[in-house]
């Protein structure tokens, strides 16, 4: 079940960027990247991994080689986020993914 709700920032945007944090990050981890890039007319959405990896730290994947890996919640969250942004008026060709480390793996 998808538990995370994306945080939408800008209202007058021509493109949407979904920011995906790295291992042990959270939805706030990518805000400094958004501020540094300063992309005009971009709506930023900061999502958070569904798997706990410490105090206010999250992961996009959970498990190990012996027991197997969990990742379906992450795929579902990203898919739902893209659909929500699309429903809010952004064509899919104007929705971009920006990930750091483990978040970049999810973006691929």
Region locations from a protein language model:
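Short, hydrophobic alpha-helix immediately C-terminal to the catalytic nucleophile
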Residues: 31, 107-108
């Amino acid at each position: 079940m998808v538990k995370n709700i994306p945080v939408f920032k800008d209202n007058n945007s021509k493109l949407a960027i979904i920011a995906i944090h790295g291992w042990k990050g959270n939805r706030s981890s990518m805000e400094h990247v958004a501020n540094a890039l300063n992309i005009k007319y971009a709506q930023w959405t900061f999502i958070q991994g569904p798997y706990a990896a410490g105090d206010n730290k999250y992961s996009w994947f959970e498990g190990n080689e012996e027991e197997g890996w969990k990742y379906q919640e992450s795929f579902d969250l990203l898919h739902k986020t893209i659909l929500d942004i699309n429903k809010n008026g952004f064509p899919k060709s104007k929705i971009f993914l920006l990930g750091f480390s483990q978040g970049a793996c999810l973006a691929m």
